[in-house]
Amino acid sequence: MITAIINARIKSERLKEKHLYKIGHKTIFEHIIDNLLNTSLINEIYLATGPRNNNYKYEKFFKSKYKNKIKLFYYNNEFDVTGRVFNLTKKIRNKYTLLVSGDCPLIDKGFIIRLYNLIKLNPSKSFILPPKKIIHEGIKIFKTDAWQNV
């Protein structure tokens, strides 16, 4: 199974609170989460964000919209994305983790399945990168324990 991490913070530099903006009738977060929930390989979803006092609005949104389906991970350093993901992976028990950029609403179930199959077929690899630039550039899969080597 796969744990998905959505990486986002409310105070992004160019467009604050962009994850709560709507595309059609859904917010960017809703597009991402609905597609992740529709992928049977994913059994756990985290939002990895900065300090709670800066990002509490996300917690309110997720509790009202998704009840207990999304776990929140707060990390005190707003700008240390690597540290945020590293520390969160210590809590994850699944063998594989999917890292999703919070401003990437183009989540495709078929693409996730292909990434998962690629990493399973290549047991010596810790992560899989697509061979060329694609529209899903905000999505990466890796072995969760690979972060212990960082």
Question: Where does each model-flagged region fall?
Answer:
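Short aromatic/hydrophobic "clamp" motif used to bind/position activated sugar donors
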Residues: T97-L98
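Conserved N-terminal catalytic core of the sugar/cofactor nucleotidyltransferase
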Residues: E30-R93
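Conserved donor-nucleotide/metal-binding helix-loop-beta segment in metal-dependent transferases, i.e.
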Residues: D108-K133
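N-terminal nucleotide-binding beta1-loop-alpha1 segment
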Residues: M1-K16
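Acidic metal-phosphate-binding loop of nucleotide-sugar-dependent transferases
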Residues: F79, C104-L106
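Conserved nucleotide-sugar donor-binding
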Residues: N94, E137-N149
